[in-house]
UniProtKB/Swiss-Prot annotation:
Organism: Cereibacter sphaeroides (strain ATCC 17023 / DSM 158 / JCM 6121 / CCUG 31486 / LMG 2827 / NBRC 12203 / NCIMB 8253 / ATH 2.4.1.)
Localization, UniProt: Cell inner membrane
The protein's name: Sec-independent protein translocase protein TatB
Listed GO biological process terms: protein transport by the Tat complex
Keyword terms: Cell inner membrane, Cell membrane, Membrane, Protein transport, Translocation, Transmembrane, Transmembrane helix, Transport
Topology versus the membrane: Single-pass membrane protein
Region described as Disordered: spans on this chain: 73-158
């Protein structure tokens, strides 16, 4: 605390011996020890009182909250650092080991489940990504006419 070396202590002891005298020197050191002990006790008691007052006012809770708010994890800096590390290690020419397989279109999944649930083992519906070609339906009465060939259009010379 005071940063006093052995040489300084020896000088203080010699001066005290000359000034106080050999008869009263032990009593003076006892008194000095008691005063030092009382000063330490007072400092310890003051520190405990300050800590108790801080506990009552909630300073420790505020300090804990401030540390949590300013921590790198809560700010997302840890996640950013991990992402940057993964990006630095990433080789675009190397295929990914855990690459997900392309998923089936969402509209074809319910159609397949509906067919399984109905027990239909006949025709499966085409996926939604490929639209089905429209099939023209002719009325039953017009069916014989549709079978005859259509007249050829005359070519015009323009």
């Amino acid at each position: 605390m005071f940063d006093i070396g052995w040489s300084e202590l020896l000088v203080i002891g010699v001066v005290a011996l000359v000034v106080v005298g050999p008869k009263d020197l032990p009593e003076m050191f006892r008194t000095l020890g008691r005063v030092t002990a009382k000063a330490r006790n007072m400092a310890r008691e003051f520190q405990r009182a300050m800590e108790a007052a801080a506990d009552e006012t909630g300073v420790k809770d505020v300090v804990k909250d401030v540390k949590n708010v300013t921590s790198p994890r809560s700010m997302g800096l840890d996640a950013m650092k991990q992402a940057a590390d993964r990006f630095e290690k990433w080789d675009p020419m190397k295929p990914q080991q855990g690459a997900p397989k392309p998923a089936a279109p969402a509209s074809s999944i319910p159609a397949a489940k509906a067919q399984q649930g109905a027990g239909a083992a006949a025709v499966t519906a085409p996926p939604a990504s490929e639209p089905a070609a429209p099939v023209p339906q002719a009325p039953a009465a017009a069916a014989p006419e549709a079978a005859s060939p259509a007249p050829a259009e005359p070519k015009s010379n323009a």
